[in-house]
Amino acid sequence: MNIAICGMAQHDKSEVDNFNGEIWGLPWDEGRWPFFDRYFEIHPLDLLRKPEAQRRDGYEDRLKSLPILYMQEAYEDIPNAIRYPVEKVVDNLGLDYFNSSISYLMGMALLEGADKIGIWGVDMADLEPVPGDPSYISEFAYQRPNMEYLIGLARGRGVDVYIPERSPLAKFHGEGIPLGLMYPSYPQRYGYL
């Protein structure tokens, strides 16, 4: 089974269009939603209904219109919602470690025995706009290590995981790593100039 996992960062849509397998994504990614085979909305419905969730008007109706939608529960108000099998996924992974919606897609792909997983639009770029700026933090600072762990777990199980070259996922970033009072730039791997 081949699975494409699509996030919302810029990516080459033609690569996804040419992917031979199921395409999974997020329901709030409305620019590309018509071609997803499965959707995952892991946030609890009571939180999604709050204005602070910043979901657009009619978002709940959108959820009701999706063909295959995984949520925390099979909500009565969302009749097409399928309960995400979190216990089975955790048992399969051996660890209850999810720091993003995308990580739940990876967990499901591993549970279902994917042979190949392609990951597009999932950069989780936690880099500061100005290197060394300690005031900058993003949610990706804790989401990315989780995703990279799941990528490593998948590869350790023999799953072919494709990550586009332009994505920073599972790639070394050699800027801003201090050595005493210096900040050397390592081009390919830590410690090597």
Regions found by a protein language model. Name each.
Residues M1-L193:
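Metal-ion/cofactor- or nucleotide/acyl-coenzyme-handling active-site neighborhoods
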